[in-house]
Amino acid sequence: MERTNEEIPRCVAFERYHDNIPNPTEQTFNLLRNLAHEYWKWFLQKLAQLKSLCFWPRCNIRPTLAGDPQLLERISQARGWKTAAIRYIEFHPTTSLMALLNNRDEVLIYDKRSECPIRLQSVKQRDTTCAAFRPWSHSSELAVGCAAGICLWQDTRRLNVELNIRNMTGTHHLQVQEDAGHQYVTSMQWNEDGTILITAALGSSHIVLWEPDSQQKIRLIPNPESSSSFSLLRYSPDFQVLFCASCDAGASLCQLNRSEWRSKQVLMQHRIQTAVWTPCGSFLLLVTDGSTRIYSCTNNGEATVFLFPKPLWRVELVMDLQEVTTCAGQQRYCGEPQTFAMDPLGIYMAIIFKAQSFVLLWLLDNSRPGAVRLLPLEFICCNVDGDQYPTCIAFGVSSAQTRLLVICWNTGHIQRYAITAKCFKEAQLIHNLK
């Protein structure tokens, strides 16, 4: 059978130095040049996408309290924010100063060396929600979140510079930090050295990184897929992770360093009511709105996907407060938590509830690797007569030997609960726990 033309194998001879055939070295060079050009175009495209997602807001929604009068109170860490006599407590990280925000939009700064507090008030300071002392500040600077943005107060008695008298309130100088749409600040956190203040606000879907000394600011979007504002910010103790809780549902765990910004979304079906880190940084304890369940969020190492490591966060149930809690023979129903407060040494935690008139003090047991337990210790009730309930709580350091749990009640009464235990075993002995 004869072969067809299609079946006859062809033999093609290449002449290396023929004029019409390019040099192999030149071919390789052209190929590499084209690949480099295409890669550079791809890199520029991805860089533009990264900038559009991380450094500029996708939308600039401006919700107002007039449109939803209950919104700020619903997401606030204070119980009954609108009517509470005291809305927020903030302790200075290294001194005995304590700042309180009241419902008259005043800041009360207490110093144990003085009986009467210093009062800071301004027409620009309205609807105050939160405050944060600046670390390592020579002038005891205090940032206050409000409707306008941020009111930054400086104690002029500690400054050696001349300031504008129009911005003076007694012994303090006021500087207002504003950003378009970034109104009704809900939460704030200073970074480790006090050079950057991070804030969230109802008026925007981004968070802002402020540098007060240089008057610079950067906008970041923790979750580019959502247009929601953020209600709560919590820096991890090592300042490597920023927890950002959405006003709608879910939260972002953002890892920060000088070269990159990585985020992971957790619990996307529910709004986070409150959250707090343990001082060791191993656990983030949180509860969702409308729930009685306390969860722990733990960094479970990193998984390498191709060349890009991604953080793995494990969420586990710690306990359910729907059940009756027993402390020292007393049994009470707790219900939904309003806010958490953590002892600076990580030995105790305190909880305010949405519908109860007491504060529940807990002992933290994280002796088991990768797990944390909460042991109920005491129901703390108001130490004065009357129908009162707690509105806000905070732990602070009173002296080298004593720490304080400060409880503010709806009538304005301030209660101090002294704590002396320096370790878990010592706390067990004090409270007769085995």
Where are the language model's segments positioned?
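Blade-level signature of beta-propeller repeat domains, shared across WD40, Kelch, NHL, RCC1
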Residues: G396-K434
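Loop/turn residues immediately N-terminal
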Residues: S96, R104-V107, A148-I150, S204-S205, ...
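Conserved beta-strand element within WD40/beta-propeller blades
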Residues: M98-N102, L142-C146, L197-L202, L242-S246, ...
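Surface loop/turn motifs at the tips and blade-to-blade linkers of beta-strand repeat domains
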Residues: A78-K82, Q121-Q125, Q177-G181, I221-S226, ...
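Intrinsically disordered, low-complexity acidic/Ser/Thr/Pro-rich linker and tail segments
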Residues: M1-L97, L317
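Per-blade loop-tip surfaces of WD-repeat and WD-like beta-propellers in eukaryotic adaptors/scaffolds
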Residues: D68-R74, I109-R119, L152-Q175, L202-S227, ...
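Conserved blade-ending motifs and adjacent loop-strand segments that build the rim/top face
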Residues: M268-I272, L312-G335, G370-S398, H431-K434
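Loop/turn segments within WD40 beta-propeller blades
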Residues: I89-T95, A131-S139, A180-H182, M188-G194, ...
